[in-house]
């Protein structure tokens, strides 16, 4: 154990040394608030439903609750989550977008959690749900990071025996936290934070995140139903479509639009706004390869006619040769053969 600690510290130090300013600042804030909790009461930094709403308006807790931890194992989870996000998501998004994602998820978790406990109080009239419950910690952001990893690298294998992919990690961890809650080993705010982190991060990444191709990610593998087992996906997909249609009618969400830009007869440009660039490029290459192979097979069949046709044509040429009505076309002056290959080009971004 003593030999492993220096190696772990050296590895962690190397990771932090190569991290961006955003990752370093978030890690430093988590450590500072944890050390501060030994000197003063940091309860005012967590979201308390009764104090977030009027007449108190503890609005600053929406920004601080995701950085506040009370146990050393919680600090380890927070630091690991931030470092993983910096290593895997920041190279794809950039430091600013990672900070925006962190802020959106944590503010959403604070608001949704406070509203949920407010509704629970209205149903039970138990003041514990207003003034005793404290929402804090990095479980909400952890849920958001897992959703983002499902979007970007869902096919990666985390465990080989049994085989567990990144795409199933969000719901697998939710089921584990639910079991811990049923066994009274986990408090309800932690489970609520993780659940609302999953939901808010998916909504942001699906509909609102800005990138070079527009907004959001409407890929099929990132649909809400794909978070659930296959047997439940048809029912969940139907309910999700109904909710989305309702949100479109009240103008909270935008209607999904797929734009097809046909530039010329020999060139077709297909633009699907809201898709991940890597996923879109992979789909284009697969479609192009399959289409070229099919066209090649058709051309081969037209080039090699049957033997009967060859015999009939040769017999006709020997028996009754006819002069050609048309003069042979000089090489280089005829029409160039039209290419049968279809290429995919990136369409200009929609304004």
Curated annotation (Swiss-Prot):
Family in the record: Belongs to the TMEM115 family.
State the protein's purpose: May play a role in retrograde transport of proteins from the Golgi to the endoplasmic reticulum. May indirectly play a role in protein glycosylation in the Golgi.
Q: What is its main location?
A: Golgi
* Subunit architecture: Homooligomer. Interacts with COPB1. May interact with LMAN1. Interacts with the COG complex; probably through COG3.
In what tissue types does this protein appear? Expressed strongly in kidney and skeletal muscle, followed by liver, placenta, pancreas, and lung, with low amounts in heart and only traces in brain. Widely expressed with ubiquitous expression in epithelial tissues (at protein level).
Which keywords are on file for this protein?
Answer: Golgi apparatus, Membrane, Phosphoprotein, Protein transport, Transmembrane, Transmembrane helix, Transport
| Disordered, as annotated region | 301-351
The opening ranks of the lineage are: Eukaryota, Metazoa, Chordata, Craniata, Vertebrata
- Which superkingdom heads the taxonomic lineage of this protein's source? Eukaryota
Q: Where is this region: Mediates localization to the Golgi?
A: 206-229
Q: What PANTHER family does the database record attribute to this sequence?
A: PLACENTAL PROTEIN 6, TRANSMEMBRANE PROTEIN 115
Its gene is TMEM115
Note the InterPro entries from the entry.
Rhomboid-like_sf (IPR035952), TMEM115/Pdh1/Rbl19 (IPR013861)
Ranges of the Lumenal topological domain:
41-97, 148-165
- Cite a single GO BP annotation: retrograde vesicle-mediated transport, Golgi to endoplasmic reticulum
The residue ranges for the Cytoplasmic side of the membrane come to 1-19, 119-126, 187-351
Regarding the membrane, this protein is recorded as: Multi-pass membrane protein
Its name, as the record gives it, is Transmembrane protein 115
**One MF term in GO for this entry?**
identical protein binding
